Amino acid sequence: MTNTRKTHPLIKIINHSFIDLPAPSNISAWWNFGSLLGLCLAIQILTGLFLAMHYTSDTMTAFSSVTHICRDVNYGWLIRYIHANGASMFFICLFLHVGRGLYYGSYSYFETWNIGVILLFAVMATAFMGYVLPWGQMSFWGATVITNLLSAIPYIGTTLVEWIWGGFSVDKATLTRFFAFHFILPFIIAALVMVHLLFLHETGSNNPSGLVSDSDKIPFHPYYTIKDILGILLLIMALMTLILFSPDLLGDPDNYTPANPLSTPPHIKPEWYFLFAYAILRSIPNKLGGVLALVFSILILMLFPLLHLSKQRSMMFRPLSQCMFWILVADLFTLTWIGGQPVEYPFIIIGQLASILYFTIILLILPTVSLIENKLLKW
């Protein structure tokens, strides 16, 4: 008699995805971040659901409802901080997951890769709208500044911004619709994750060497289920350490002041995970140019399969490309730092140089270095 898990219409899908899935025998801990992102999404949906039970999306009561959650709801403070810091963990895992894909050439599975980039955009949109909901000073002014960027779109810009606002400024209508979108988007993300996995399982996983691993596969369970559980335990430990010892470390003190349209905070800045993109936006003096640079700083990821000129897939055996990759990582850290600094000398020029370097490395230096390495192989 055949096993139920191999014959049952529903269970066999799970079986082919997480149990009897043939996986390369040499994938490292860098391949753990997919499952960690799944965990982060589950944590965010669950904690978000419980927060939504007590939250009110009205400008008069939103700030008070968050205070009420933290003070009066059983373990409300814990749920709120898991949700806020869970977002930071989500982005740490996202950046490492994308970085892994760039380093090991996983972008050559271009359907999987492009859906991943769409997922990144969706998560960024969700996080931005979530940041507006507590209706603190940085929530209000962040929403005002970022939505205002759309007014740079020629001809329809101003109309588009007022349409998104639902009025002539960020107000009750804006908050209500942001709450609605913030609630629905994670479920759309979950659906996209399924498609992401569907395309991944069409080809199978990449591996550190970048070589075809069909001749050397092992079952996902128990080998990688155990490995994933270890990663999950480490993630939960890191998250709970952050929440219980320093829950406001990554937040902005300005957001503990209720939103006031009449007083602008001295430095308007987004959460830390958007600072690199914010620095690129600010480094261009022209409004439309800045918005385009902001969008292309993420959209450029879709060009990686086209810009790959090396004869090898992975960077594992390409020391020159490795060097450029780590310079790119350092550049992103620099941009993140600059994004949190005031707009004054010397930060302006550092931000502009870091932004130029970011696009130059990706569009020019990495492909050129790849061609040099191809020549070195012959030599």
From Swiss-Prot:
Listed Gene3D superfamilies: Cytochrome Bc1 Complex, Chain C
Cofactor(s) the record lists: heme b
Subcellular location: Mitochondrion inner membrane
Key word Transmembrane present: yes
Segments passing through the bilayer: 33-53, 77-98, 113-133, 178-198, 226-246, 288-308, 320-340, 347-367
Membrane topology of the entry: Multi-pass membrane protein
Keywords on record: Electron transport, Heme, Iron, Membrane, Metal-binding, Mitochondrion, Mitochondrion inner membrane, Respiratory chain, Transmembrane, Transmembrane helix, Transport, Ubiquinone
SUPFAM superfamilies attached to this UniProt entry: a domain/subunit of cytochrome bc1 complex (Ubiquinol-cytochrome c reductase) (SSF81648), Transmembrane di-heme cytochromes (SSF81342)
Gene Ontology biological-process annotations: mitochondrial electron transport, ubiquinol to cytochrome c
Keyword Metal-binding recorded: yes
Binding site for heme b b566: 97, 196
Main subcellular location of this protein, as a coarse class: mitochondrion
Cofactor binding remark: Binds 2 heme b groups non-covalently.
Amino-acid positions noted as binding heme b b562 in the UniProt annotation, renumbered to this chain: 83, 182
Pfam families, per database record: Cytochrom_B_C (PF00032), Cytochrome_B (PF00033)
One annotated Gene Ontology cellular component of this protein: respiratory chain complex III
Domain of life of the native organism: Eukaryota
Cited PROSITE patterns: CYTB_CTER, CYTB_NTER
Protein's job: Component of the ubiquinol-cytochrome c reductase complex (complex III or cytochrome b-c1 complex) that is part of the mitochondrial respiratory chain. The b-c1 complex mediates electron transfer from ubiquinol to cytochrome c. Contributes to the generation of a proton gradient across the mitochondrial membrane that is then used for ATP synthesis.
Family: Belongs to the cytochrome b family.
Extra information: Heme 1 (or BL or b562) is low-potential and absorbs at about 562 nm, and heme 2 (or BH or b566) is high-potential and absorbs at about 566 nm.
Assembly: The cytochrome bc1 complex contains 11 subunits: 3 respiratory subunits (MT-CYB, CYC1 and UQCRFS1), 2 core proteins (UQCRC1 and UQCRC2) and 6 low-molecular weight proteins (UQCRH/QCR6, UQCRB/QCR7, UQCRQ/QCR8, UQCR10/QCR9, UQCR11/QCR10 and a cleavage product of UQCRFS1). This cytochrome bc1 complex then forms a dimer.
Name of the featured protein: Cytochrome b
